[in-house]
């Protein structure tokens, strides 16, 4: 099967375990998410606060904790794919079904971001029979629970 992500060699992998607690990534088995169109790695964004000091014209700022971290992407829907079926099923579990996930970067250093996340958004795009019709896609958001571990 051809993977859409192959054009840049960036891939998203989904862990098979949904146990509580989840196993360490090295003890889980993973499957590549097929027909991946795009994936955005989780961002690092700190909360910030501002304050003023009396008789000082400059505003001061301080950084806090990491904001919510998400990974957004889309895929070409293949409803015969067990992975796509599992992702859709996970998206309607109250409280979120957490899994291990990782993204492999397309760089020579083979960077890998490991994280625990649940599917918080699963949106099927509109069917479009217009001149510029494209494959039916699904947009998704993975909400990270905890830290993102980077390995090379």
Q: Predicted regions span which residues?
A:
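Sequence-level detector for tyrosine residue identity
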Residues: 3-4, 13, 102-105, 152
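Acidic glycine-/aspartate-rich tracts in secreted/extracellular proteins
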Residues: 78-81, 147
């Amino acid at each position: 099967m051809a993977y859409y992500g192959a054009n840049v060699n960036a891939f998203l992998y989904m862990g098979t375990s949904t146990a509580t607690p989840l196993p360490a990534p090295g003890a889980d088995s993973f499957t590549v998410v097929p027909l991946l169109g795009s994936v955005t790695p989780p961002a690092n964004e700190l909360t910030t606060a501002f304050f003023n000091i009396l008789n000082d014209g400059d505003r001061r700022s301080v950084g806090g904790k990491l904001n919510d971290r998400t990974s957004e992407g889309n895929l070409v829907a293949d409803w015969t794919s067990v992975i796509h079926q599992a992702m859709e099923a996970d998206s309607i579990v109250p409280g979120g079904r957490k899994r291990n996930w990782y993204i492999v970067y397309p760089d020579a250093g083979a960077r890998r971001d490991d994280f625990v996340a649940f599917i918080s958004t699963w949106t099927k795009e509109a069917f479009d029979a217009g001149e510029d019709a494209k494959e039916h896609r699904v947009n998704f958001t993975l909400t990270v629970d905890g830290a993102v571990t980077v390995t090379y």
